[in-house]
Amino acid sequence: KSARGLRFLGCNELQIGSLDALEGMTELETVCLAGCGLWSIQPLSSGKKLRNVYLGRNNVSDLSPLIGCDIAEMYLDLNKLNGNSEAFRGLTVHGFIVMNGNGYAQEDLEYIRSTINGEADLEI
């Protein structure tokens, strides 16, 4: 049976390293991928139904594959965003983003909010 209709994926702490197997999974709504050793989330770009994205404790620096999703919850704590305020440009978030441990300061939050479509609560 095909997994292409998969809506929820939980692989926390599995050190999978790559999301290539998720390419083309357009029905995903929730991904729990914390602590998986990920550098790229590019295969998530076809999952425009994503609402809940848990990517804490990885090595992600590019969030652009999530453009086009309407995100409700996103955990990005302890990744490699390195204080890059432009990393959020074009994302749509109607909910919150947890982004502590990525080099952001309180004074960065207003600018980051201005690059996001929607109403996002930001937590550092």
Stretches found by the model and what they are:
Residues 2-61, 65-107, 111-124:
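Concave beta-strand-loop units of leucine-rich repeat
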